[in-house]
């Protein structure tokens, strides 16, 4: 037991409760990780305020997203900051805009707070508009994350179908990890 995922993609309205939960968690499990995964810049204003599950709303602004990151760090005081940004949308070579801006905000704010950041790597497809990544696209996501200072790489595989051939795209993260590990 290394910790617990408390909430995925909370909104600003949840931060006070998360702060109280973290204080209790730290009291009883001081050596464990209180883990919350945060939203990307393409979340709507409603999602950043109310949480991802609410949906709807207008496109958010960079200012609101920066407030979201800063408020979470200052109120919850996490051991690390985790977020997701799934850039490989629609057909190749489309990449969701804001990928580097999002990473820059997270890298900057976590550096100020002296905490590491982790990021999720898109490793599969879902919902019709998110494509299956190639090995090169997974490598690109991992290497750009490391270049920005990410200390944790997580792979979002959703419901990757089982295949034990070693050639299925579900094996791409293993290959990337081997390459990074050999450096």
Describe the predicted segments one by one.
Residues 1-183:
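Glycan-processing catalytic domains of CAZymes
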